[in-house]
Amino acid sequence: MIIVTGGAGFIGSNIVKELNRRGRTDILIVDDLKDGQNYKNLRGLQFIDYQHKDDFLQSIENDDFDGTDIDAVFHEGACSDTMEYDVNFMMRVNYEYSKSVLHFCMQHRVPFLYASSASTYGSGKHGFREGDECEDALNPYAFSKLAFDRYVRQVLPEAHSQIVGLKYFNVYGPQEHHKGKMASIFYQLYNQLKETNKVRLFKGIDGYKDGEQRRDFVYVKDVVGVNLWFWENQAPSGIYNCGTGKSHSYNEVGQAVIDAMGTGSIEYREFPEVLKGKYQNFTEADPANLLAAGYDEGFHDMKAAVKEYVDFLDNGGYFEYGK
């Protein structure tokens, strides 16, 4: 059996779908469906069971899985809202919960692959290499992720099974509808074009011209590919960047969406006051450690990925069961 926490979420549901494509349906989905929307991500997936995240936590604390053959745990479940400022809540959900799942996997020698975040690099002024010298946190979400990364580094020497943390950069692609304002810029711009025939980007700030802030945007299929590559190849434990290593400006993103949809123009809006001092104007993964681990499967070209994503959205926007 394979366990995917956050399996009804964006990246988790994509991992499940790819596992299905590879013939695996013996999957336990762990999530919380209370928002009434993310259940839609499950309709096109094949899995043997579902468990609420609180019940799953109780199960691992009670050792209810003793004797169950678990091949891997993909821990994608988290609160990823960068505008959530309840630090106690963030630490409970993203740090304490993750520690419980980690120690369960260590105890039973189950590969543990988890979602970290490029937000742990703060402003990025020290670079984007995995390690304390580059890391910082601009918001509670980033702090909760950074705290867990640091905890993992402490326990790695005593681990007898694989532990892999992947610092996701800006992920985009199918099955992110439910994320609302936290969905990728690609999804936001797709909807803007549908409604107004325009895409609205931030004006310049901190020395950047209008729309010229740059991020490392990574297609969700590539994120899934990196996860499964580490697991299937029993690659070395550690914390790795999961980004393309090449940044693109928001102007490039806006134009890619316009080109994919065949219509539209770009306009600029004032940079929000609430984000000043808390916003990453530039991100770009340093891929050295990922490549050193042996990963050689590459990443999608952004324009091609955007066209594929737009076509997916135009054709219903959710995975189909059995396809």
Predicted regions and their residues:
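C-terminal substrate-binding subdomain of Rossmann-fold SDR/epimerase-dehydratase oxidoreductases
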Residues: 194-323
